[in-house]
């Protein structure tokens, strides 16, 4: 990644958008470097994109984060920006505090990689005496919502914070399998009424941007984790892949087909062999 030039990031974003469209993805939630090149690709294609910052000890600064927040949110009606940082284990205390201050200033949700690995959570508890979720709560980052990507190694108090703050957990099953991170406790989120969404994660940790594959893995892994084939209904999984994601990205005008909503929709050809017979 350190060798990627601006043009590389631009054209790789174009390639990613093309792959998104092949599996019916109408918008993406992107945390990456060289974001002005990423946003140029989405503006040129007209693809709906929500960016969030990957701020950490090695990339960007609070000043760049604030600049991008104001720039992208005024750029187009198909682009928006939410505050965020890469992860607790890559981001020092002063930077975390700066994100919390910006969240208060702009009344913005905050996003980060959260409890993806067991070692990540253990390290955070050694440094702060808290899990990543509890640390963000103490710093005041969740006053205006947000959530976390992965959310595998969660504790009881973490679930309470997600429920009470109306946060979203984004599960990334292919990535979690490839990196042997663990399996998201999806049913516990679901039973607590916490909003859930499904993500693909990045190409380095997935190799594929196929939402239908992610839906299958999301339901399959949850069933195995709970040893319950009926643990989460299929319509709930579909909700996570559609409206759940829209709510996570603050795209509340794209969450369902209704009068006055944006017409973000896909068509599925029911005449293809894999879609027959329709009755079962």
Where are these regions (language model features)?
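A structural motif
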Residues: 25, 47, 107, 166-167
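Metal-coordinating catalytic core of metallo-dependent amide/deamination hydrolases
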Residues: 37-152
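Short, acidic/turn-prone active-site loops that include or flank metal/cofactor-
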Residues: 53-58, 116, 173-177, 202-204
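Histidine/acidic-residue-rich catalytic or RNA/ligand-binding cores of hydrolases
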Residues: 118-130, 158-163, 180-189, 206-223, ...
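His/Asp/Glu-enriched, well-ordered alpha-helical/loop segment
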Residues: 138-145, 187-274
């Amino acid at each position: 990644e350190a060798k990627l030039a601006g043009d590389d990031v631009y054209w790789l974003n174009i390639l990613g958008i093309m792959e998104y469209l092949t599996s019916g993805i109408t918008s993406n939630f992107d945390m990456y470097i060289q974001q002005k090149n990423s946003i140029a690709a989405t503006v040129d294609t007209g693809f709906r994109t929500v960016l969030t910052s990957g701020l950490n000890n090695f990339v960007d600064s609070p000043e760049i984060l604030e600049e991008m927040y104001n720039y992208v949110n005024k750029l187009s009606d198909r682009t928006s920006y939410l505050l965020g940082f890469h992860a607790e284990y890559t981001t020092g205390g002063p930077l975390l505090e700066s994100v919390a201050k910006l969240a208060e200033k702009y009344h913005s949700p905050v996003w980060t990689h959260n409890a993806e690995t067991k070692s990540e959570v253990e390290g955070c508890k050694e440094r702060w005496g808290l899990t990543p979720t509890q640390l963000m709560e103490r710093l005041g980052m969740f006053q205006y919502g947000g959530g976390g990507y992965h959310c595998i190694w969660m504790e009881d108090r973490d679930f309470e914070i997600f429920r009470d703050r109306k946060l979203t957990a984004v599960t990334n099953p292919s990535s979690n399998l490839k990196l042997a991170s663990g399996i998201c406790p999806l049913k516990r989120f679901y039973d607590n009424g916490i909003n859930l969404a499904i993500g693909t994660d990045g190409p380095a940790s997935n190799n594929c941007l196929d939402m239908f594959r992610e839906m299958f893995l999301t339901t399959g892994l949850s069933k195995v984790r709970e040893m319950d084939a009926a643990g989460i209904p299929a319509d709930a999984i579909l909700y996570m892949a559609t409206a759940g994601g829209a709510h996570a990205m603050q795209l509340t005008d794209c969450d369902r087909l209704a009068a006055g909503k944006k017409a973000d929709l896909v068509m599925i050809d029911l005449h293809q062999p894999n879609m027959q017979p329709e009755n079962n």
